[in-house]
Design a protein with these regions (language model features):
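Amphipathic alpha-helical hairpins
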Residues: 1-180
């Protein structure tokens, strides 16, 4: 009986530490985006894309505040832990922006690059929300769910914009150039 109790306590401590490590990772990811998203918005011609990215930039500030609230509630500091994955995805987006795809294809590429970041965040927020629920931290779970909803909404907006406007315009230009 004692061995089972010891193992269970160790698992709870392990999940709690995993939760902290992962929200630190997400916290850094959000802060990296604060520096990157304005450049992503400026790089595109499509006004709706710029509007979506600028709105998400403002939401990202709220995501950071929610994470800081979670750290405060847990009595923890959001110590800097570099999110290497988002750092690499942001670098990939910068590399894409420097290629000579032409303006229409560049917009399609930028949307895809931002969606890579969004998908990483959706996975991360979904995981930490689940951890918070398992740890009985309903307040953190609710805050994380709010952000998860916003991230998913951003992804849907970008998908719709890409699918119904940007990608088709890029394809038209490519088709005209290819068949000319």
């Amino acid at each position: 009986m004692t061995m089972v109790m010891f193992t269970k306590n160790r698992e709870v401590k392990g999940l709690h530490q995993l939760f902290l490590d992962q929200i630190r990772d997400i916290y850094n990811a959000e802060n990296q985006q604060i520096g990157a998203f304005p450049r992503f918005a400026e790089a595109a011609l499509h006004s709706e894309y710029r509007t979506i990215v600028k709105k998400h930039f403002e939401q990202t500030k709220n995501h950071i505040l929610r994470l800081e609230k979670i750290f405060e509630n847990l009595g923890e500091n959001p110590t800097d832990r570099e999110c290497e994955a988002v750092n690499a995805l942001i670098q990939k987006a910068h590399d894409i922006a420097e290629k000579n795809y032409g303006p229409r294809a560049l917009e399609a590429a930028l949307i895809a690059a931002v969606q890579y970041i969004e998908h990483y965040e959706i996975a991360g927020y979904g995981a930490v929300r689940s951890f918070a629920r398992q740890l009985g931290d309903d307040e953190s779970a609710n805050l994380l769910q709010q952000t998860l909803n916003e991230e998913a909404h951003m992804d849907r907006l970008l998908s719709e914009l890409a699918e119904y406007e940007v990608n088709s315009r890029a394809a038209e230009v490519s088709t005209r150039l290819f068949h000319a």
